[in-house]
Amino acid sequence: MPKPLHALLVLALGGACLSSPAFADDADRPLLLTFCDAANIKESACTKAKGYPDAGNRACDVKLTADRYSGRFVASGNPLLVVNYESGCEAHATNDGGAVMFEQSGGKAICRGFAPGSRVNDCVVLKGEPQDQLACLTGHMGQGILESGVAQMVFTEGYNKDIGIATDMLLTAEDSNGAFGANVVTCKEGPKNFELSDIKAGPRPETVMVKAGYADAETIKKACAKGFPKPKQTFGKLTRGDAYVPEGYEKRSTFIIDLVTRKVTPQG
C-alpha cells in the first residue's frame, strides 16, 4: 500500500485554552493547569481537558508524555513547546492521542491548541531564521504493515491565536514483515523503502539525515528473478507481480533530505 512521496495531511486543531502559572520545564502541572482544573490533575494527567476538540459531552483525559520539543516554529510568534499526549478519546487511527502546543511567553505557558493524531516522536529541531523547523519520524501499524516516514511539521497560527499543524511527508517506507513474513516489492515499480530510523540534523542547514533499509532497482530485479532464498516463514499469498526481499538482503544507507528542495540523496 505505497503512498505518494509528497503527501500533505492537514490536521485540524480545536479548543481554546487558558493561560497558566509560571512555566517550569521540569514539571507538567503548570502545563496541565492551562487547560485543566486543579482538582482534575493527577501526576502528568488531566481527567477532563477543557476545550478538547470534538469532545461533545465526553470528559476527555489528556496524559502528557516525555516526548516534547521546543523552538520558534511560527516566524511571527514566541517559542512553542510541543508535547505528546495520550487520550482515551482518541482511537488507534489517531495514534491514541496527539500533540498539544504551548506558547512560552514571559516565563509563562499558554496553551495554543490540541492536534489529535499528530504525535511528535523521534524528532529533530533545526534552528534557523526566520523560524526553526521540526522534522519527525512517523509510524503507523495496520494489518501487519508498518508504514513509516520522515515528515516536516508545519505550524500555522489562526486568527484566534490557536496553532495548527500540517504534516508534510518528505519520505515514506513500508515494512511488511508482520503481514507476509518478509518485505515485499512490486516488480514493475521503482525503488522502495522498508524502514527509516535514527533521524538527526543533516550536514547542511535545513537538512536531516535518516538511516534507511530499502530495495534499489538492482535488489528488485534480483528479487523478481527469484535470486534470493525463500524467507523462512511466510504468511498469506503474494499478489501476482510481487516478490519477497528476505531479511538481510535489503540495502542499507543513510539518506540526506533537504527540507527546501525535498531532494533525497545517499550520504557519501
Language model region names:
Residues A55-E129:
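Short N-terminal edge-element motif at the start of the domain
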Residues L18-A24:
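Sec/Tat signal peptide C-region and signal peptidase I cleavage site
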Residues R72-E86, K127-H140, Q152, D198, ...:
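Acidic/hydrophobic-patterned starts of short beta strands in beta-sheet-rich repeat architectures
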Residues L8-C17:
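Bacterial N-terminal signal peptides
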Residues A24-K50, G142-G268:
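Acidic, small-residue rich beta-repeat scaffolds with periodic aromatic anchors
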Residues N95-A99, G107-A109, V125-K127, Q131-T138, ...:
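Long, charged/polar, surface-exposed segments that mediate recognition or autoinhibition
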Residues N84-A93, E103-G106, T138-G142, M209-K222:
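Short, flexible beta-strand-to-coil junctions
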Residues M1-L9:
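Bacterial N-terminal signal peptides that target proteins for export
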